[in-house]
From Swiss-Prot:
The keyword Protein biosynthesis applies. One of its GO terms (molecular function) is ATP binding. This is Alanine--tRNA ligase. Binds 1 zinc ion per subunit. Keywords: Aminoacyl-tRNA synthetase, ATP-binding, Cytoplasm, Ligase, Metal-binding, Nucleotide-binding, Protein biosynthesis, RNA-binding, tRNA-binding, Zinc. GO terms for biological process: alanyl-tRNA aminoacylation. The keyword tRNA-binding applies. The lineage of its organism: Bacteria, Pseudomonadati, Spirochaetota, Spirochaetia, Leptospirales.
């Protein structure tokens, strides 16, 4: 066999199918566009699913690709086997109603043998159990019947990717690697063939004969046109062609391992040699086996994490992000076996990017953000890791205390799911403690978890158009807010209806409409559909399969199929939507210009009231950055760029730098919206004709919707005026309420902390914004922040002053002093007084103590307070009692020990506290007894 590099194999494959009239299609994102049933792109056919089912018009009938893929179903064996990876590249060729079984089989064999260099005499194939046709074709191509194996549905019926889509029987190509790769019994039994669990036969090419479409209920329906979907794992092909021991020993992955060798000081080849020694009672071999797995795990996981973050999938608490976080944590844990105690993964980003940048240039643009994100995750987990190690100690102790010798699978899964501990690491740790590991119990818990997260999400939205004859709705709304259209569908209670009557709610479909359906973040239009006295109020507009549905209720009259209606969009609302949608584009442009190309749109809401924009960015924006972004947008508004929309072939749109919305699926032709030099984006929404129409832009809030992402909420045009009017109205009310409280509770003493700010009124705000535009936005932002700061400072001063006055009143309160003395204890040498209060700080207790000592010369004062989260205690005494042996510091330490806290001080004054406030009474009582014993010599 020829020994080719990974990049050479990739190019040979793609060029072969290019010569066979296949369109070479670039890899899609790891985030499946428009497919909620998949967490990640798991196969080459994912981006082609609509083409197989006939849901979209075919741009080509033959295609080939090298697709980035991510699968975590075999995560626990990654690093242990020679072929499993979470991230891999899938080579594939596809036919959409063009060729079928014979050509697909011919291409696979020809490419494998005559171009990639596989030995035909070592190739075995499998076919579906009743696929006689495929078997006959293989035989005619020169594969003898004895090297053809029939397998059942589990092995040779593939698909769909997700819980719906194209699927069918398949045929796979295997390479016979020799009996030495087989299991103990394989060499002598003579029955070893594809399907055996040993490593002798390795599958390297799968041909799926797509004949069915599986719906979300699992039902199979014949496809209108058959198709071919093939998959050939690039890493696995390289393993075979390079004669490597594992995919990790192929040229690209071995290069990544060399980076880890350099960082760790451990040689991978030495580890491999030692790991092959007998492991029984051989600690060196056992350590080496663990280090071999560690090298492979961190090598695999850095690719998965790097490519995922590069595609905008950031670590998070749920969904896709959780998988990425888990991979980082798993790699961090395995890194400890290579002596990595500090963050290390992030250090490899630039080097790994260099390997893959020629094929995936987008990685180079995002490398800084990827590195920053990984570092933050590593630092976060290292804090969690110590907690996890403490937890495992607790669980081991619990197991031993209960008399058990087996560490439970449930406890192991707790460590796996909560702290990211791989089962093998837990097994190793508990073995050192003399415990067996419940593998079966762990697997049962793991399987339960898999069933809950099987890489698919169910969509709950009711599909009104299922089973309906589809006639696309012509959208008139780019140029007009009104127009005529005929009713072609009616729905009532989510079911087709012949008519809608007064008082009924439902949906109306017209053949033409000016109503914009929700899409691209922009909410659907509202308005009215009319015919004479028949009036339908549109409350929302949605789109399904190019059909626009008007949801609402019949206010009067009746509606039936074929009626011609006058459609009228609510103009004022649409205008605000235009302001906010165009503002969103300018905001996106500002973020990419000021923060970097790693910024990807992760979601948006365009409503009449505000805009919300989610984007990938690893850290919170500073106040300075927020102001720069806001100013950049306002400057683009001031320049009054013309807003130009045009339809272009998608490749032409990409050439002019048009920015795609993350996760969206596009056809061959796209609508592009350009705003001068500020923004060029794919977009189907409604916009202003010139940016100057927007007026002004203001950022209300910046926050995080999840790890690795940021969110900006902003307003444009009239909404800016309303925002500042509301904000200053709230500030006015806050100032008035605070000043009133200061005057009423502090009298003249509070005059210095009153808020003296001239808050602008509604008319003043409107006039200044309309006159000065963006300059006024900055002015009102600064003024509102200044007034808010004054309110905060005055509130703090008020509370401090109020507390001081309350403390002074408390310390000098005659009735409090009398009450304390009423419970005094006379020892004959001096008096002891004590009391417990609620919510008093140590200074107040000390002040009261000083006033008590003024009344008595020989006095010991023990005061305590129960506060919200703790208890505090102050003990003071006169100098005469110090000479009698009293030491307040010693007494406080005794009390605080009973409170679970600390304290101390001088002989005549000490203070402290603790969390266990429920013990305050008994602690003070004990201190009194100790003091009495010291003063009288009597034992207590």
């Amino acid at each position: 066999m020829k020994r080719q590099s990974v990049s050479e194999i990739r190019e040979i494959f793609l060029n072969y199918f290019k010569d066979k009239a296949h369109a070479v299609v670039p890899s899609s994102s790891l985030l499946p566009a428009g497919d909620p049933t998949l967490l990640f792109t798991t196969a080459g056919m994912v981006q082609f699913k609509p083409l197989f089912t006939g849901a979209v018009e075919l741009p080509y009938t033959r295609a080939t690709s090298c697709q980035k893929c991510l699968r975590t179903t075999d995560l626990e064996v990654v690093g242990k086997t020679e072929r499993h990876c979470t991230f891999f590249e899938m080579l594939g060729n596809f036919s959409f109603g063009d060729y079928f079984k014979e050509e697909a089989i011919d291409y696979a064999l020809d490419c494998s043998v005559n171009h990639l260099g596989f030995d035909k005499e070592k190739i075995w194939v499998t076919v579906y159990t009743d696929d006689d046709e495929a078997e006959k074709i293989w035989i005619t191509k020169g594969i003898p019947k004895e090297r053809i194996t029939r397998l059942g549905k589990k092995d040779n019926f593939w698909g769909p990717a997700g819980d719906s889509g194209a699927c069918g029987p398949c045929s796979e190509l295997y390479l016979d690697r020799g009996v030495e790769k087989g299991g103990p019994d394989c060499a002598t039994s003579g029955t070893c063939r594809p399907g055996c669990d040993c490593d002798r036969f390795l599958e390297f090419w799968n041909i799926v004969f797509n004949q069915f479409n599986q719906d979300t209920e699992g039902n199979l329906h014949p496809l209108k046109q058959t198709g071919i979907d093939t998959g050939s794992g690039l890493e696995r092909v390289a393993l075979l062609l390079q004669g490597a021991d594992s995919v990790y020993d192929t040229n690209e992955l071995r290069k990544i391992i060399s980076f880890y060798e350099e960082l760790s000081g451990i040689k991978y080849d030495d580890v491999i040699t030692l790991s092959k020694m007998p492991t029984q009672k051989n600690n060196t071999a056992r350590i080496a086996a663990n280090q071999k797995a560690a090298f492979r795990v961190v090598t695999d996981h850095i690719r998965s994490v790097l490519f995922s973050i590069g595609d905008g999938i950031y670590p998070d608490r749920t969904g896709r992000g959780y998988v990425i976080r888990r991979l980082i944590r798993r790699a961090t844990l395995f890194g400890r076996k290579l002596n990595f105690k500090e963050p290390f993964l992030y250090k490899l980003v630039d080097k790994v990017v260099e390997i893959y940048k020629p094929r995936y240039p987008e990685l180079g643009k995002n490398s800084a953000a990827i590195q920053k994100t990984i570092l933050a995750e590593e630092e976060l987990f290292l804090k969690t890791l110590e907690l996890g190690l403490e937890k495992i100690e607790t669980l081991v102790a619990k197991t031993k205390t209960s008399g058990k010798t087996i560490f439970s699978g449930a406890d192991a899964f707790l460590l796996y799911g909560t702290y990211g501990f791989p089962a093998e690491m837990t097994e190793e740790i508990v073995a050192e403690q003399g415990l067996d590991f419940d593998k079966k119990g762990f697997q049962e818990e793991l399987e339960k978890d898999r069933q809950l997260s099987r890489e698919s999400w169910k969509a709950n939205k009711v599909s009104l158009m299922t089973g309906q004859s589809v006639e696309k709705t012509e959208f008139l709304g780019y140029s007009s807010l009104s127009g005529k259209g005929n009713i072609i569908h009616l729905f009532n209670e989510n079911k087709p209806a012949g008519a809608l009557k007064e008082g009924q709610a439902g949906a109306i479909v017209l053949n033409k409409t000016p109503f914009y359906p929700e899409g691209g973040g922009q909410v659907g239009d509202t308005g009215f559909l009319r015919q004479g006295k028949n009036v339908f109020k549109v409350l929302d507009t949605q789109k399904e399969n190019d059909v626009i549905l008007h949801f609402g209720e019949v206010l009067s009259g009746e509606f039936s199929i074929a009626q011609e209606l006058e459609a009228e969009v609510e103009a004022a609302r649409r205008e605000r939507l235009r302001f906010h949608h165009s503002g969103t584009h300018l905001l996106n442009g500002a973020l990419r210009n000021l923060l970097g190309d790693h910024v990807l749109q992760k979601g948006s809401v365009v409503s009449p009231e505000y805009l919300r924009f989610d984007f990938s960015h690893p850290s919170a924006l500073t106040s300075k950055e927020i102001r720069k972004i806001e100013s950049w947008v306002n400057e683009s508004i001031r320049k009054n760029y013309p807003v130009v929309t045009k339809e272009l072939p998608i490749e032409d749109a990409k050439k002019i730098g048009a920015v795609a919305t993350f996760g969206e699926k596009y056809g061959d032709r796209v609508r592009v919206v350009q705003m001068g030099d500020a923004s060029v984006e794919f977009c189907g929404g409604t916009h202003v004709s010139h940016t100057g129409e927007i007026g002004y832009f203001f950022i209300k809030k910046e926050s995080s919707p999840g790890a690795g992402n940021r969110r900006i909420e902003g307003v444009c045009g009239p909404a800016v005026i309303e925002t500042f009017q509301n904000r200053f109205a709230e500030l006015t009310e806050s100032v008035q309420n605070l000043n009133l409280k200061i005057k009423s509770e502090l009298d003249n003493e509070g005059s210095k902390i009153l808020v003296n700010s001239n808050v602008p009124g509604p008319d003043e705000i409107r006039e200044k914004l309309e006159k000065e535009g963006a300059t006024a936005v900055t002015f009102f932002r600064d003024l509102s922040e200044e007034i808010a700061s004054q309110i905060e400072e005055s509130t703090s001063a008020f509370l401090k002053m109020k507390k001081s006055l309350e403390s002074r009143d408390f310390e000098n309160n005659a009735s409090v002093i009398e009450k304390v003395f009423a419970s005094s204890m006379d020892t004959g040498v001096g008096k002891i007084v004590s009391a417990i209060f609620d919510d008093k700080d140590p200074n107040s207790l000390k002040g009261l103590s000083d006033n008590l000592k003024v009344r008595e010369k020989n006095l010991l004062v023990i005061l305590g307070s129960k506060n919200a989260d703790n208890a505090s205690v102050v003990i003071t005494c006169s100098s005469q009692l110090v000479s009698k042996g009293i030491h307040c510091g010693d007494l406080v330490r005794t009390v605080c020990e009973m409170l679970g806290g600390k304290g101390g001080g001088k002989p005549d004054m000490a203070q402290g506290g603790g969390k266990e406030k429920q013990n305050l009474e008994s602690a003070i009582s004990f201190a009194i007894q100790l003091a009495k014993q010291t003063l009288t010599g009597e034992k207590v």
